């Protein structure tokens, strides 16, 4: 029997999306080859935009192509490899999985970026360690200089995620509420949508590898406030031994209240941001101005997140009338109904 060729990807441990996809590959039992790098790699094609992780898949001509964006890659792997899929078979439950993955990738990452570059202890940890993952065999002086360069590049980008003196407390309060809701959910359920992990779990895991396991300020908060969540991150790192079944997903007519509580946090903070950002992008505005959790929110428009909203609406539109009715009821209960409004 011929061994399957390993999937090649490039990434670093400090990238939440790299960690998301590595955990996914382990759970899927898909062989892979990780190149520990953050920049162009000799012998491999360059991506249009240098994002981590970068996957290298054979193109139609057999030549490798550089592919980025974790969510489409997750779906591609589900389409190409039938065993141990992470997308629920029920299209309505799959929609909820998409929403949770999107929330993790696009909102929880605000907490990750905010904590990493807003507090001195976290800035020092990141500046000291991030460059050492790819440039460890160098002098202390050069490593310190690399850390200063990374911090100097990343701290000004806080404005892109909406982190400032006004919005910082909103981000932190939202992270605390998410921890409380997820901690309560984990008392009875091992994963967001049942007894097997979905894309949303891997999205949340990716962000928590940094928030709960690397950056000192949110790490301390997580360990103290949500010990089950803290432990969950360590467990999800490698789920290759889990044996899932088709019956492990929640049924749409039996969603637990603890999941609704998590979705309410999505409706409270992420839904208004997605909607305001989409309006700003459509209008060609120079900044997003809205209110989130009773506080003013200002950030630069993000065209990618406008696409995220469009993709969610496309997925909802593809459901049959009964499935749409079920999703509409769940989202209304959670305060997310505006996401699917025409």
Give residue spans per PLM region:
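Active-site segments that bind and position negatively charged phosphate/pyrophosphate groups
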Residues: 189, 194-198, 233, 239
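GST superfamily/GST-like fold recognition
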Residues: 192-212
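GST-like domain detector, emphasizing the conserved glutathione-binding G-site
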Residues: 1-141, 192, 212, 269-342
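Short N-terminal edge-element motif at the start of the domain
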Residues: 159-194
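Alpha-helical scaffold segments in carbohydrate-active enzymes
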Residues: 96-106, 181, 205-210, 235-238
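Divalent-metal (Mg2+/Mn2+/Ca2+)-assisted nucleotide/phosphate chemistry catalytic cores
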Residues: 122-172
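A non-catalytic, amphipathic alpha-helix used as a structural packing/dimerization or gating element
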Residues: 92-100, 170-177, 181, 228-231
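Active-site/pore-lining binding-face segments in mid-to-C-terminal subdomains
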Residues: 205-296
């Amino acid at each position: 029997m011929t061994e399957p060729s390993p999937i090649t990807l490039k990434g670093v441990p400090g990238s939440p999306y790299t960690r998301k996809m590595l955990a996914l590959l382990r759970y899927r039992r898909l062989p892979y080859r990780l190149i520990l790098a953050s920049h162009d790699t000799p012998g491999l094609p360059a991506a249009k935009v240098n994002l981590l992780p970068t996957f290298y898949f054979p193109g139609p001509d057999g030549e490798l192509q550089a592919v980025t964006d974790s969510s489409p890659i997750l779906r591609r792997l589900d389409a190409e490899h039938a065993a141990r899929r992470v997308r629920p078979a029920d299209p309505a439950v799959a929609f909820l999985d998409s929403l949770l993955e999107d929330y993790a990738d696009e909102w929880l990452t605000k907490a990750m970026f905010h904590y990493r570059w807003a507090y001195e202890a976290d800035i020092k940890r990141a500046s000291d360690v991030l460059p050492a993952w790819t440039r460890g065999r160098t002098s202390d002086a050069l490593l310190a200089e690399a850390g200063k360069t990374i911090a100097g590049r990343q701290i000004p980008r806080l404005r892109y995620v909406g982190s400032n003196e006004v919005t910082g407390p909103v981000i932190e309060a939202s992270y605390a509420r998410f921890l409380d809701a997820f901690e309560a959910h984990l008392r009875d359920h091992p994963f967001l949508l049942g007894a097997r992990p979905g894309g949303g779990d891997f999205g949340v895991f990716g962000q928590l590898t940094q928030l709960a396991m690397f950056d000192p300020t949110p790490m301390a908060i997580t360990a103290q406030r949500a010990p089950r969540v803290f432990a969950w991150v360590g467990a999800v790192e490698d789920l290759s031994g889990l044996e899932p079944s088709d019956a492990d997903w929640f049924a749409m007519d039996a969603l637990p209240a603890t999941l609704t509580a998590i979705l309410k946090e999505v409706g409270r903070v992420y839904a208004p941001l997605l909607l305001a950002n989409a309006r700003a992008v459509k209008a060609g505005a120079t900044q997003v101005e809205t209110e989130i959790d009773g506080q003013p929110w200002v950030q630069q428009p993000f065209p990618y997140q406008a696409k995220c909203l469009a993709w969610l609406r496309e997925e909802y539109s593809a459901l049959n009338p009964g499935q749409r009715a079920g999703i509409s009821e769940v989202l209304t209960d959670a305060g997310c109904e505006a996401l699917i409004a025409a």
